[in-house]
Structure formats: structure tokens, C-alpha cells
From Swiss-Prot:
Pathway: Purine metabolism; purine nucleotide biosynthesis. The keyword Nucleotide-binding applies. GO terms for molecular function: adenylate kinase activity; AMP binding; ATP binding. It comes from Schistosoma mansoni. One of its GO terms (biological process) is purine ribonucleoside salvage. This is Adenylate kinase 1. AMP binds at residues 40, 45, 95-98, 102, 139, 150. Pfam families: ADK. Catalyzes the reversible transfer of the terminal phosphate group between ATP and AMP. Plays an important role in cellular energy homeostasis and in adenine nucleotide metabolism. One of its GO terms (cellular component) is cytoplasm. ATP binds at residues 19-24, 133, 178.
Length: 197
């Protein structure tokens, strides 16, 4: 059941393997277009930090490199969107959907997505970026063992999501191995085709 308030929401899903630079590009898009930026990972980490019973359960799952149940993530996203939609109806949703069911359920229960930005980069580059980030991030999922699991999860579960939206001609695939600015220029150019200016 969709919420009436969310009928006008325009959603862009942002996908890419761990360390593909999604977060950095989302920050730049927010600066330029003033989108609402929701990261499923940030919402989950905030829940973990709150120390709630649900947060403790989520922390254990994230440390094991497992995917958090669909309903939990969807509820957190929907709640955040309802709070923000009156100010701005454009949303960048980062790191979601991780698997096909999540995308289908989101579109059924929240709203259809406008397009999907897919940041494509080799595992070697992503691994180097993640290990460099691990030196300063204090994130429970930035360690060698969990990184390998996160790549496997991405390959097995998220790639079918990208294929699904490709069939609807909604995917913007961006080579994310260049500089931050070069990547951003490409994203900007492609978004214009979906009426984002």
C-alpha cells in the first residue's frame, strides 16, 4: 500500500559495488540538485548507533556481512521519505535495491523509480579504495574478509537488479574508475535524458 504523500516522489536508485564511489557522487549530486539523499546503509547504521534492540540485531548481521531483511530497510526508507517529501520530492536512494525483490517491493509499496545510476568499476579498484577507507572509517564492514563477502553479495544479488531495470531502459551505467569530477560530468550528462536538469 503506497502512501499518498509519496505519490509525487521522484526516485533515483544509485547502485554499484562496495567502494565504487556511490557516496561521493551522491554528495556532489545533492550539492548541485538539492536532492534528498537517503543511504540505506546510513539509515541502518543510525539504527545500530541508537542502541535499540533492533539496532543490536542489525549490528550482528552487518558484522557477518549478511543482508538485512527487506521489510526493515523498506520501512526505514519509507519513514525517512515521508518526513522529507513535502520539502523536496526528488530522492537519491543509495545502495538500494540490493536484490530484485527489494526493487519490486519498493515500486509497489512506495513509488516507481525514475532511473537507476549504476557505478561500474573493477573489483581490484574497489578493494583498494575500501582498504584505504578502512584506515579512517571505523566501519564494521570495511575489513578484508567482509569485503570479499560484500563483493559476492553484490555479484549474486545486485547484478540481476541492474538487468531488470535495463530491460525497462532505466539504467545509466557509468564507468567509475576515473576522477571524481570526470565521473560526475558523465552522470550529469546522462541524467538530462531523464529530465533532471
Amino acid at each position: 500500500m503506497t502512501d499518498q504523500k509519496l505519490a509525487k516522489a521522484k526516485v533515483i536508485f544509485v547502485l554499484g559495488g562496495p567502494g565504487s564511489g556511490k557516496g561521493t557522487q551522491c554528495e556532489k549530486l545533492v550539492q548541485k540538485f538539492h536532492f534528498n539523499h537517503l543511504s540505506s546503509g546510513d539509515l541502518l547504521r543510525a539504527e545500530v548507533q541508537s542502541g535499540s534492540p533492533k539496532g543490536k540485531e542489525l549490528k550482528a548481521m552487518m558484522e557477518r556481512g549478511e543482508l538485512v531483511p527487506l521489510e526493515v530497510v523498506l520501512a526505514l526508507l519509507k519513514e525517512a521519505m515521508i518526513k522529507l517529501v513535502d520539502k523536496n520530492c526528488h530522492f537519491l536512494i543509495d545502495g538500494y535495491p540490493r536484490e530484485l525483490d527489494q526493487g519490486i517491493k519498493f515500486e509497489k509499496e512506495v513509488c516507481p523509480c525514475l532511473c537507476v545510476i549504476n557505478f561500474d568499476v573493477s573489483e581490484e579498484v574497489m578493494r583498494k579504495r575500501l582498504l584505504k577507507r578502512a584506515e579512517t572509517s571505523n566501519r564494521v564492514d570495511d575489513n578484508e574478509e567482509t569485503i570479499v563477502k560484500r563483493f559476492r553479495t553484490f555479484n549474486e544479488l545486485t547484478k540481476p537488479v541492474i538487468e531488470h531495470y535495463k530491460q525497462q531502459n532505466k539504467v545509466i551505467t557509468i564507468d567509475a574508475s576515473g576522477t571524481v569530477d570526470a565521473i560526475f560530468d558523465k552522470v550529469n550528462h546522462e541524467l538530462q535524458k531523464f529530465g533532471v536538469k
